[in-house]
Design a protein with these regions (language model features):
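N-terminal leader/targeting and pre-domain segments
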Residues: 1-53, 156-157
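Short active-site neighborhood of thiol/selenol oxidoreductases, capturing the structured segment around
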Residues: 51-62
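Thiol-based oxidoreductase modules, predominantly thioredoxin-like and allied folds used
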Residues: 59, 74, 83-106
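The canonical Cys-X-X-Cys-His
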Residues: 64-67, 122
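Short, glycine/acidic-rich beta->alpha junctions
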Residues: 66-69, 102-103
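Typically the conserved alpha-helix immediately C-terminal to a functionally engaged Cys/Sec
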Residues: 68-81
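Structural alpha/beta surface segment adjacent to cysteine/selenocysteine redox centers
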Residues: 93-119, 125-128
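Non-catalytic, surface beta->alpha helical segment in thiol-disulfide oxidoreductase systems
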Residues: 113-157
Length: 157
């Protein structure tokens, strides 16, 4: 599936805008994670090489613990490397409809396009809109988010 990055940019916010727009107490939780997390510097140096080639698109909700753990790390990665990180925020479950996971709206309709089941869904896309890979909820194969991102990118580039 090719992804329309221009369309995505119009419907998303930067990761820093997303965190700053959160309501309390969620904003403080995200900011605390951002302030206390230490990036793996060697991995960050390698990720810098891909700043002009890769865009990260993530789906998030303020109430989600895995989002609280990983979206602030994406903000740090973006700041340290120049990688563009775009966020679809405000996802809400739909308890009234067992056949549908997300309530649309307020969840963006892209939850269907990207087949979002669990969050955060972190999608790595090249500048041509080709899907490079994804991380669902948290890193699975590497100990840190930045190492998992680098692993996925290196497998395709």
């Amino acid at each position: 599936m090719n992804i329309n990055l221009l369309g995505i940019k119009k419907k998303t916010v930067s990761v820093s805008q997303y965190i700053n727009s959160l309501k309390q107490p969620f904003r403080d939780k995200f900011l605390k994670r951002k302030q206390t997390y230490q990036l793996e510097q060697e991995t960050i140096n390698q990720l810098k090489k891909f700043a002009e080639k890769i865009v990260i698109v993530a789906f998030s909700a303020e109430w989600c613990k895995d989002c609280t753990a990983n979206i602030p790390v994406l903000a740090l990665i973006s700041e340290a490397t120049g990688l563009e990180v775009r966020i679809f925020g405000g996802l809400q479950k739909d308890p009234s409809n067992p056949k549908r996971k997300w309530r649309i709206p307020p969840s963006p309709p892209e939850v269907k396009t990207f087949d979002v089941d669990k969050i955060p869904l972190i999608v790595i896309v090249d500048r041509e809109g080709k899907n490079v890979g994804k991380i669902i909820e948290k890193p699975r194969e590497k100990p840190t988010l930045e190492e998992e991102l680098l692993k996925i990118i290196l497998e395709k580039h």
